């Protein structure tokens, strides 16, 4: 199976009828995203149904850290003024670090974690402006090498260690494309736990 086919299968797995969690609001929104773009498809749904977690009591927002001379953008959230925090890496879907991913970080922060969501496509492009899924896969997703992603996650842990995180208590979670990344990074032994949301176990 090619990486392109693998990525397409990741996206297809979100459709109702392709998973055991049928009818979920996020999957319905993602199905609608085909051909019209993620942001355009989900914004009406988000406005009506999404939970937005307040940043009150948190230090939350965009960050950057350097990996091999490249500044990796990311979103991070943590309880304000706290140190020695357990760390959770939050891995994007194929659509990048959008508001749902940022909100997931804030929810973890409310529970006492330092949560970091790196923009793992940053070198290849911004997925948020795409309206055609096959083009997104061809232009960006299939051009992101696993080695690059692993290095960027190493960098995220290094950032966490220098900014109030206890990387001896670290985990990783991710969605769709990010679910596969969870399995890959968990296998390195650099995190203590990994939870993948419909991430594939096959592919390059």
Regions found by a protein language model. Give the residues of each.
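N-terminal twin-arginine translocation
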Residues: 23-28, 38-53
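Short amphipathic alpha-helix adjacent to the substrate-entry channel of hydrolases
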Residues: 99-118, 122-123
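Primarily recognizes the serine-hydrolase "nucleophile elbow" in alpha/beta-hydrolase
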Residues: 155-204
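N-terminal secretory signal peptides
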Residues: 1-24
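Gly/Ser-rich "nucleophile elbow"/oxyanion-hole loop immediately N-terminal to the catalytic nucleophile
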Residues: 131-173
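N-terminal cap/lid segment of alpha/beta-hydrolase-fold proteins
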Residues: 50-80
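Short beta-strand element of the alpha/beta-hydrolase
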Residues: 85-93
């Amino acid at each position: 199976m090619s990486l392109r086919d693998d990525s397409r299968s990741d996206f297809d797995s979100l459709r109702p009828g392709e998973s055991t969690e049928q009818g979920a609001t996020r999957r319905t929104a993602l199905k609608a995203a085909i051909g019209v773009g993620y942001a355009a498809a989900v914004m009406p749904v988000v406005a009506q149904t999404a939970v937005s977690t307040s940043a009150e009591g948190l230090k939350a927002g965009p960050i950057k850290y350097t990996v091999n001379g490249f500044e990796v953008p990311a979103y991070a959230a943590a309880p304000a003024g706290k140190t020695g925090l357990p760390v959770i890496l939050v891995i994007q879907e194929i659509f990048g670090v959008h508001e749902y991913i940022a909100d997931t970080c804030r929810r973890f922060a409310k529970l006492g974690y330092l949560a970091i969501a790196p923009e793992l496509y940053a070198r290849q492009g911004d997925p948020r402006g795409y309206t055609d899924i096959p083009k997104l896969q061809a232009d960006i997703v299939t051009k992101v090498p696993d080695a690059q992603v692993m290095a960027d996650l190493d960098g995220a842990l290094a950032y966490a260690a220098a900014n109030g995180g206890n990387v001896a208590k670290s985990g990783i979670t991710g969605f769709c494309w990010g679910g596969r990344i969870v399995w890959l990074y968990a296998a390195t032994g650099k995190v203590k736990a990994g939870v993948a949301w419909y991430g594939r176990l096959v592919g390059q």
